[in-house]
Swiss-Prot record:
It comes from Staphylococcus aureus (strain bovine RF122 / ET3-1). The gene is atpA. Belongs to the ATPase alpha/beta chains family. This is ATP synthase subunit alpha. SUPFAM superfamilies: C-terminal domain of alpha and beta subunits of F1 ATP synthase, N-terminal domain of alpha and beta subunits of F1 ATP synthase, P-loop containing nucleoside triphosphate hydrolases. It is an enzyme of class 7 (translocase). GO terms for cellular component: plasma membrane; proton-transporting ATP synthase complex.
Length: 502
């Protein structure tokens, strides 16, 4: 076959004309030192603060310390394969995580990568992890209740949508249980929940995920897990990743509940990173900006005004104390940032009062505006009753001669404590809470033995579901308190069929 020279030259000419020279210029640096999840890099002179850099094996790092001769980078992943002299290149982008509806029902790490073995997450939307909090004029005051389903909280320390309410207490006092119960109670409420597990055992995270799955709560929940075995940088960024995922829903007019479990471990991880980066230590060896670490996170929880869609993020940060010391550095910081705290006491927990909420030291700075009218009316005197009972209880230990008024106060107090007890993973609808608290405050439980109170409440709830549906529906739908006559009739009717124990 004859090859024509003209055809070859024409073909070559067309190929050369269509050739585009593509070159990309990237800043490249060299690893000077590596260890404990920190790398010192020489040569990345133009790197931005918080920029992602890429190591030769594909592992990413976060530029934290920008110094004259080197850059301190925290490594977001395994660093065993990185050695001195390795090449590092800039990516030109700051850290982002995937966001969107596709994340609901999944368990992801702080980088947004799935760790539940259910395949990739098909979302193309991302948001930067570090973002300025919503401005003052874009917010609205908190005026809408977020029902936790826990009587002691909804009655005494109510939480509103857009609020930051701290859960604080020693280890093993039921902090996570309160948070999980609140997530369970958001079923059918149109709230997206995000549970951020920081520095917990893998087995604990797995147990909590299973609890949510069995209750059907994973249908509206995202779990962000940075377990104890992960490098410190992942524990440090986990809460920011969680709130970034939540902001996507908030700016689309939805309500979000986010739980940070717990910020003590995040602060410890940040302290570790700061000391390794040779930043000067301050009180309790924490760096000087540990307040800003938590304030910039918690300020991102907000209730947006109606022009921006009226969405909200409600934050429940958890802090673990040592021997009830709430005056330590991190607890005092977070107490000053949040809109109130739920203080759990180990003494109460071990004496069988669960949830072990200390009503005297717990407070909600939003208060009554985060309660439905019915609850506000029936629970108005509850805190004072409980406080006076605790005071009288300590005096009553010293003498047996009590006047009738004091004795009746003590008896009412015992019943109040009993009513506020609640089993875990059994959140109670607000209409049932109003019913039992009305019965308590109006004296209907005064003639019921203390040992029967829990049974009385359970049976009253079952009875009301079939015999007082109008009353319950009115509370649920209007939020107002029905006529006292309706309550009195219903409770008296039930008491006729209730049998006290001998």
């Amino acid at each position: 076959m004859a090859i024509k020279a003209e055809e070859i030259s024409a073909l070559l000419r067309s190929q050369i004309e269509n050739y585009e020279s593509e070159m990309s210029v990237t800043d490249v640096g060299t690893v000077l030192q590596i260890g404990d999840g920190i790398a010192l890099i020489h040569g990345l002179n133009d790197v931005m603060a918080g920029e992602l850099v890429e190591f030769h094996n594909g592992v990413l790092g976060l530029a934290q310390n920008l110094e004259e001769s080197n850059v301190g980078v925290v490594i977001l992943g395994p660093y065993a394969g990185i050695t001195e002299g390795d090449e590092v290149k800039r990516t030109g982008r700051i850290m982002e995580v995937p966001v969107g509806e596709e994340l609901i029902g999944r368990v992801v790490n702080p980088l947004g990568q799935p760790i539940d073995g259910q395949g990739p997450i098909n979302t193309t939307k991302t948001r930067p992890v570090e973002k300025k909090a919503t401005g003052v004029m874009d917010r609205k005051s908190v005026d809408e209740p977020l029902q936790t389903g826990i009587k002691a909280i909804d009655a005494l320390v109510p939480i509103g949508r857009g609020q930051r309410e701290l859960i604080i207490g020693d280890r093993q006092t039921g902090k996570t249980t309160i948070a999980i119960d609140t997530i369970l109670n958001q079923k059918d409420q149109g709230t997206i929940c995000i549970y951020v597990a920081i520095g917990q055992k893998d087995s604990t995270v797995r147990a909590n995920v299973e609890k949510l799955r069995q209750a059907g709560a994973l249908d509206y929940t995202i779990v962000v897990a940075a377990s104890a075995s992960e490098p410190s940088p992942l524990l440090y960024i986990a809460p920011y990743s969680g709130v970034t995922m939540g902001e996507e829903f908030m700016f689309n007019g939805k309500h979000v509940l986010i739980v940070y479990d717990d910020l003590t471990k995040q602060a410890a991880a940040y302290r570790e990173l700061s000391l390794l980066l040779r930043r000067p230590p301050g009180r309790e060896a924490y760096p000087g900006d540990v307040f800003y670490l938590h304030s910039r996170l918690l300020e991102r929880a907000a209730k947006l005004n109606d022009d921006l869609g009226g969405g909200s993020i409600t934050a429940l940060p958890i802090i673990e104390t040592q021997a009830g010391d709430i005056s330590a550095y991190v607890p005092t910081n977070v107490i000053s940032i949040t809109d109130g705290q739920i203080f759990l006491q180990s003494d109460l927990f071990f004496s069988g009062v669960r949830p072990a909420i200390n009503a005297g030291q717990s407070v909600s700075r939003v208060g009554g505006s985060a309660q439905i009218k019915a609850m506000k009316k029936v629970a108005g005197t509850l805190r004072l009753d409980l406080a006076s009972y605790r005071e009288l209880e300590s005096f009553a230990q010293f003498g047996s001669d009590l006047d009738e008024f004091t004795a009746s106060k003590l008896e009412r107090g015992k019943r109040t404590v009993e009513v506020l007890k609640q089993d875990q993973n059994k959140p109670l609808p607000v209409e049932h809470q109003v019913l039992i608290i009305y019965a308590l405050t109006k004296g209907y439980l005064d003639d019921i033995p203390v040992v029967d109170i829990t049974r009385f409440e359970d049976e009253l709830n079952h009875w009301a579901e079939s015999n007082a549906t109008e009353l319950l529906n009115e509370i649920r739908e209007t939020g107002g308190l029905p006529d006292a006559e309706k309550f009195d009739t219903a409770i008296n009717e039930f008491k006729k069929s209730f049998s006290k124990s001998e």
